[in-house]
Amino acid sequence: MADESDMRNELNDMQARADQLGDESLESTRRMLQLVEESKDAGIRTLVMLDEQGEQLERIEEGMDQINKDMKEAEKNLTDLGNLCGLCPCPCNKLKGGGQSWGNNQDGVVSSQPARVVDEREQMAISGGFIRRVTNDARENEMDENLEQVGSIIGNLRHMALDMGNEIDTQNRQIDRIMDMADSNKTRIDEANQRATKMLGSG
């Protein structure tokens, strides 16, 4: 009888330990799911901010392009005014930056999404679950569902990271263009001011 009682107690202890491990494992998958969902939300916010920043850079580049067009008109007017005043005309194409033609930017919204790659986690889900079933109870069902969601979100995070990298590369190239345009516009404005000052002084 004592042996049976000891065995029963041992089995109860093993069952209690198994239940404890099951509860801890379930809680672990819940924490994992919460963490990747928070990461996904942060990724979405970052993509939105990058998109807004891209729109601002687009407006800045359009403004620089408009200044370029306005300067061409101003340089033409200064040349015409110089001719009327009997001054030696200075062709616009001799001005620094005057011959530069700016068109539509070469960078735009990423037109293609990265190819979807089926990794080991997704392959496990396709082949029948993320965990090896022991008790086949509701806890294991939830653990499997949680891990499936974690795997899916991690795949989305990978794609987000690729999109972020592409967008940042695009914006870096756009910033370089804007800097070049700003330098060119400043040079042309300075030279136009010098010409105008010379005309006024000669008058």
Curated annotation (Swiss-Prot):
One GO term (biological process): synaptic vesicle fusion to presynaptic active zone membrane
GO CC terms: cytoplasm; membrane; neuron projection; plasma membrane; presynapse; SNARE complex; synaptobrevin 2-SNAP-25-syntaxin-1a-complexin I complex
Recorded coiled-coil stretches: none
UniProtKB keywords: Cell membrane, Coiled coil, Membrane, Repeat, Synapse, Synaptosome
MF (Gene Ontology): SNAP receptor activity; syntaxin-1 binding; voltage-gated potassium channel activity
Tissue occurrence: Expressed in several regions throughout the adult brain, including the mesencephalon.
Pfam families tied to this protein: SNAP-25
Gene3D superfamilies the record matches: 1.20.5.110
Location of this chain's protein in the cell: Synapse, Synaptosome; Cell membrane
Residue stretches of biased makeup (Basic and acidic residues): 1-11
Family designation: Belongs to the SNAP-25 family.
Role according to the record: May play an important role in the synaptic function of specific neuronal systems. Associates with proteins involved in vesicle docking and membrane fusion.
Name of protein: Synaptosomal-associated protein 25-B
